[in-house]
Amino acid sequence: MSKRVVLTIDDIPQMVTKNMVDYLVKNNIPAVMFAVGENIEKHFDTVVYAIKNGITVGNHSYSHPSFSAISYEEGIEEIEKTEVLINKAYEEAGLPRKVKAFRFPYIDKGGDKKELFQRYLRENGFMKIDDSEIEAKSYYLVGHDKDIDVACSFDIREYNVPSNDMTFDEVMLHLREGDGEDGADIMNRDGYNIVLFHSHDDTEKVVPKYYVTILDELLNAGVIFTESEWKN
């Protein structure tokens, strides 16, 4: 057995994203990065750079809304506007887009519209990371295994630092200790997890190179970052 992790990174592209890509390439860490359409329009070349460097880019909506707070039609528009931008980035990179993946902002799957969104994603060729080996009970309790969007089994929670909801020391403690008896533990127990991380300029301003500190910690603990396997 081993400690295996699929690394997923939300909210690209931002100013820090290119440096994160360089770190990932240097350390041979594969990753799936979920892009926000508005951010693609601001930093289009960064998305192209990520694709050229082996990053799989997925869809994270256009304006990052809570999908339970918008209509079904608005949600579809959020997805489709971003699809156009991602396809354009792959075309500019000169590489085929082999995977269509979507992650809901805040993992908010639409509330009473959830099944409508799930049907849309399935009917339009979206895929999910293979989650058949995840052991964290919490992942199954909320039904992530039954859905086609990409969720996660372990949330690093570093995005809480700029708002002072968590200190960086508390983030590192959470990283080292895991989510408790029924949750995921990516550093101390063998297993397989889909990990949620973020590319955030706000976090970089508070803790410069936060991504280096966190990912180095995982590498030093013997975590193996694996390529994502996809399924319909």
Give the role of each language-model region.
Residues 1-104, 110, 217, 224, ...:
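Active-site beta->alpha N-cap acidic-glycine motif
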Residues 4-5, 192-194:
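Residue-level preference for the first positions of well-ordered beta-strands
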Residues 41, 66-193, 201-218:
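Catalytic domains of cell-wall/extracellular-matrix polysaccharide-remodeling enzymes
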Residues 60-62, 133, 198:
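Short loop/turn segments at strand-loop or loop-helix junctions that form parts
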Residues 131, 222-226:
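Short beta-strand edge/turn micro-motifs at domain boundaries
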Residues 194-198, 227-228:
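Conserved active-site loop/cleft motifs that coordinate metal ions or position small ligands
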Residues 210, 230-232:
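C-terminal accessory extensions appended to soluble enzyme cores
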